[in-house]
Amino acid sequence: MGEFKSQLRTLLKKNLLLKGKSKCAICCEILFPIIVILVIFAILVLVMAFKANYDPYNASNFVNRFENTVLLYGNADGALNVEQLGVMNILKNEVATAKNLNSTQIDQLFIEINDQTAMEAFFQNKSDFVFSAVWFNNSALSSGTNPFQYNIRVDSDDVMDTEELIKEDDTSDSEVYVKKRFVATQVAMDQAIFSYFGLNKTLNVKGQRYPDPWTELWQKWIQGRDGIFKDAGSVFITAALMIFGFRLITDLVIEKETKIRESMKMMGLNDLAYFISWMITSLVTALPVNLIISIILKGSSVIHHTNWGVVIFTLILYLLTLLLLAFILSMFFDKSKFCGLLSFVIIIAINIGGIFVAKYDFAPGAKLFLCLISPIAIACSIFAMSARDLEEINTYNWDMMVTENQVIGMLVLDIFFYIFLVWYLDNVVTTEFGTKQKWYFLFTKKYWFPKKCNENGDEQDIESTYQNEDVEMTPVGVGQKVTISIRNLRKEYNTGDGLRVAVNDLYLDMYENQIHALLGPNGSGKSTTIGMMTGLTPPTNGNAFVHGYGILNQMSSVRKHLGVCPQTDIIWQQLTVLDHLKIYASLKGVSPSEIQREAEKMAVEVDLGEKIHSQAGSLSGGQKRKLCLGIAFIGRSDVIFLDEVSSGMDPLSRRVVWDFLLKYKKGRTIILTTHYLEEADYLGDRIAIISHGKLRCDGSSLYLKNKFGCGYLLTCSKILSSMNNFNAQQVTEFIHNYIPEATILSNAGTELSYRLPTASLPHFAQFFREFDDRLQSFGLLTYGISVTTLEEVFLSLGREAALEKGGFNIDQNENQDLEQLRKSIAISSTGVKAGQQFKGLLIKRIKTSIKDAKSFFLTLVIPLVFIIGSIIMYKAMDKPQIFYNNATVPLTMNLGIYSGLENNFVPMQSSNELNWENSLNSSPYFNKFRFIPQTENFEDYLIEGKTNGSFAYKSSAGAINFTLPIDVSSTTIDYTAFYNKDYIHSLPVHINLVNDAVLRKHNNIGIQVTNMPFKHVLSNFDLASEGMNISSIVYFIIIMMAGYALMAGSFAGNVAQERTNRVKRLLYISGCKKYVYWLSNLVWDYFFSFILILLTTCILAGIRENYKSQFGLMFLCLILFCVSVVPLSYLLSYRFASFGKATGAITAIHFAIGIIFVIISLNLRIQVLIDQDVDFQKAADAVDIVFCILSPLFAYSRILFLVSEFPGSVRVGTLKVDNYWSMDYGGSPMIILAAHCIVWVSWIMILDYTPELIGKIRNPKNIEAPPPPDDEDSDVTAERTRLLSVGPNDEPLQFRNLHKLFPAVGKAAPKAAVYNSTLSIPKGQTFGLLGLNGAGKTTTIAMLCGDIVPSSGEVTINGHDLITDRGQALRSNGLCPQFDALITLLSAREQLTLYCAIKGVPEDKVKEVVEAFIKMMDLGAIANSNTGGYSGGNKRKTSLSIAMLGNPSIVSLDEPSTGCDAVVRKYIWNVVSELAKDKVIILTSHSMAEVEALCYRMTIMRDGKMKCLGSIQHIKSKFGAGYTFDVKFKKEYLDSGIQTVLKAIPNSIVLDEHDVMASFEIPNPPDNPVKISTLFESLSHLTILDDYNVSQTSLESVFLKLTGASYEDRLNLNNQKHTSD
């Protein structure tokens, strides 16, 4: 439990550190959910009832409003009767008096039309000038039984629908009567009627809406809650909270993708601690945000009746289930490319489905079962919470619903269910990495009750049947403990080309206190074996045991012993060195009190003491490997797997690692894979060689040399200048004259080696004497002799394996291969052809698209689903929308129309109840009146009536409040008519109710007013929208925009990925024309776009006539949109480093900007249509043009709205589009779209051609470089003087005063990566560029390839200035970069074919060249497999092949053999040697043997400066002297052996000593190498030595002297120690 707590604490710290490094992500996590909730909150605010009380409107304002209009009147009988005429005259006189008009003028305003048809016609023609009309149906006079009748006529859209009485929606409100002209006419007519019948009282009438009954805050949300939150609330909540799931799943999959999690598991990670740590990390920000969301929803009373605890608890439980779902979904992703986006979409889609589960009635049990899916559960919960708050207006069948309490129970159950799923799926889901259980594992006894395997008996049985004569069966030493037993381990892969056996029944034992080196060619199965041993890869068959625990079923026990340094770096870029070591120390069980000390100690031990607080991302490649080494060793690990731990390290760093391994091997079993055979020989107590997945041999280095080597190894170095005329046969014949049994081993590059049998030792003296004399005549520079080396053993076994398998053999077909190589190299580029490049690049895009199904799905299928979905929705929403009231059925405005309502009464209030009753008791509806005492506030009564049993608010159409008493003496009838908005005719009804009652009381004559609407005169908007569904058009276009935005975003992802992976850089350096690169991408993406365009336009043409008639416009618009948005997306991709981020962000950018602009534009256009304002239209046009310039998606939407005939698309004063192509309509957006294409493509070209442009504007050669260093080597100075004095010459590569200063980053000072270097390399020379990691080698190559612009200085390639004539300078360049820039979705064959096209290899020769390189590089077995699955060595071979294609004159090889085995490395040397005959080769390498084999001239860089310059022999002579010899003593003779050697060879110096190894230097050699060899042979006969090697002072010694002060310190320390002895 203590270990669990410690791990949990460490993982939490790790996660929080990672989280804290991304401030932007934290801000998004906090702000995004709150913004999402605020969005729905804003929507709810828009529809809420803002006021509990509403202001009264004056209804007695006819005279004031009667301006510049006319009033029509007439009688159906052809003339008005005396009463009607009298009333109208009174009304006329009132207007005339108020406005001071004469009779003629007033007659022009009151027009009598006694023909209904004529009146209708007049209104239709001049509706804008008609205030209202009064129509009398007959000429009958009024009486007690026949009220005064009149009809008020206004536009049907200015009154409510006369065919309905009650309408409960937000748009229905009796207020329209008072806002428009109906009530004003009604009150004016009633006033005139009063006057005509002698009632001289002035009507002062107001209309006022009922006070909102929902006075409390929670009630104000009713409309939004019912229409929006009840259904969509859960979607917004899910979207808000899923941001944490998005971040979590992305982090989880990234750790899986980079193998970090599995590496942690290998070293003791507790899965429970891992998951809990991520859960807690997510909750650190998620819980506070979740609480804020709860406070917003509950505190604002959007959720009211549900108590605080339920709301908060529900959201917390739901958040937990979302995070657990993120864990579950992460199991099914191996790549982080789309995991977050797809998971987000999946969860939202499920939640939307949950809305329908919540809404529709079906078995509650089934609903509860579906609530096992938590997004469905939250939909049911939000629906239930909203329903409780809506019970006052809606009725719900709770028997068919899931309550919020039930949902809480289900969410709790969900949590336990999801935890089980996380555990189960983590054990059984097969992914790219990790060993998984059988699906039924939880039902097996061995899972719950594991037993430690008793392997000994099993081993005896297996061992008795295992026979391999090339295995040293007895361990070295006495009493060695077997810690690892591998038994018939097998791994098979189905590659698509058949079954490939990676590991073939491997049988091997490894021992404690030993380093067991695991060697083999690339692809031999070394890394696969380690993967199976550590649980990274499940075995197909067999088993292995670590301390007795089997890897098949007891991997968790195995991993408690493991420390692993895999081939790839398992680091977090943002964490420091110390952070890493502390994390892994805790995982391995180091006590908390010791973690800090152990981590600091380990950092110093792996030579990272000065970098302990530096972020891992800032470390060099070698330093990252050291960090991984420290991670493997820290803590309790006693079984260490090191997979190419020193790969990419310089010699000094490699020696540090060697010292470390020898120091820490005690008590441990170390399994080491390496391609440096001297490293295996130096470190390995036992060495196993695997070939084609099968164990070839195993034993100590001495055993293998005795078994597979014989005698001595003579290694000669050729004079580079005589390479073309070198005759190896001549040397061989000379050797055979003295030693007939000598055999040639290797003739690669400048190296020539022979095996000399032991029996030939007596002939050595005479042979070497003659050989020394003829060395120069043979074209040889130096030679050395040693006993059989491990490399010879490796090469020998490699030949045997090749013969057995019929595979690659460097020697068997040497002449044939070299001849084929010469032919292939001789096929030169015939000149870069844009057409050929374009074809190759287009084929690249086609093949990568076909192979990347997910990208294809995202690029084409999902956008197509969006587009087709939008079209289906558009078609489904086919019913035309009517935005006006067109009902013309007459409706009498009296209370009788609402008489059917139960408990309906009219509340009335007056200052005098008796007076009130006496004044209104003549009304036929008097029994419906109810007096409200003056002591009670009338409006409060109406408000409280919602819960008052005596007053049913919903059943009350209106109320009357008299502000003055009604009596005989009063001259004014002053009252307010309150109306219930749901009773849509309430206001005129209640005004008539009072006026009718008052007149009846006066002279027993009533008033009957009828609403008789005119047929609606269509407005411009009505005309424009007639017959269409505007909502469907808007939704259709918005969804269509989303589809095309996603398409554009996905196109950008590919470009971002190629830029980040440096594929584009290599293409450019290889000669790809920049415009061709972009053209190929554009054409392919345009092709995809064309598919969508064709489908879209054809489908639209089939469903709508307007789309069919404007097919050409639509088609061209989409074409122009795509040709403009694709390059814009490319441009935006420069801000993003990965496919997923680029796709998601750019899609959001396009869509968000487009939608915002569309909303603004539509509102402006509709307002223009309504106002018919030309100036406003010009302003809207200007806004649209600006929006079109800023967003191609908006420009496309403008055409869509135009063709869809959206209201407002037409010009002011017109009803139809006369010419869709005119500048007023489609012309301007189309021209702007075309301009977009030109602008964005030009912008991209400018960005890409910036180096060339800089060269024209600011040539670095005109900028003065800093002065040369004071301590500059004389040879470097001589080269500088020579070049600067003679000026340009015919040497292919020259650079003068080359300097690169990188600006300061943060607090760091500016760094001079390359310091004022001058150099010229002649044709036919291989130049070595050496130095420690970070010395400036790669920066130099990058400047020579044009990838980095120098700060100062000039580079000339084949006479062309790299800055001012970049294209010609780089025309014949080849580059093998340090990090493979391969297209992972293409095979080696496909990549070579592509680069043949890029480099201009004749098309009829491409296949021949490609097949030759595949054969020579031994890639035949995997040539059709994607390079993403290649081993590191095979990737290097592919990269080298690309560099050599097209016979370039200058080839830069940046560590070309890193990760390659000895066989392949030798072959690469042959290739490079062949290239060097007529080319310039620039080579960087950390292998000194490689440099000696290949390079004629070299320099060693330190801190960006060249520390030496010249031939290898010159540098050796200048900085080293005499001979060096390395010996391996028998263990018991280490100390005495060193003293023996020092006494036997005077003046010898101890250079280095490690364990049983020692290196000596003889500054003043006593004699030639044969004498020294004779001396060591005699020592070996005395059983002091196991092995030795004699040679001239090694280049590595010189390298260490020139690059490392620590080397000199150690040299002095060694010699002081042995001198004192």
From Swiss-Prot:
Family: Belongs to the ABC transporter superfamily. ABCA family.
Xref: PANTHER family: ATP-BINDING CASSETTE SUB-FAMILY A MEMBER 2, ATP-BINDING CASSETTE TRANSPORTER SUBFAMILY A ABCA
A Gene Ontology BP annotation from the UniProt entry: sorocarp morphogenesis
Domain ABC transporter: residue ranges: 484-717, 1293-1528
Subcellular location as annotated: Membrane
UniProt GO MF annotations: ABC-type transporter activity; ATP binding; ATP hydrolysis activity; ATPase-coupled transmembrane transporter activity; lipid transporter activity
Protein name: ABC transporter A family member 2
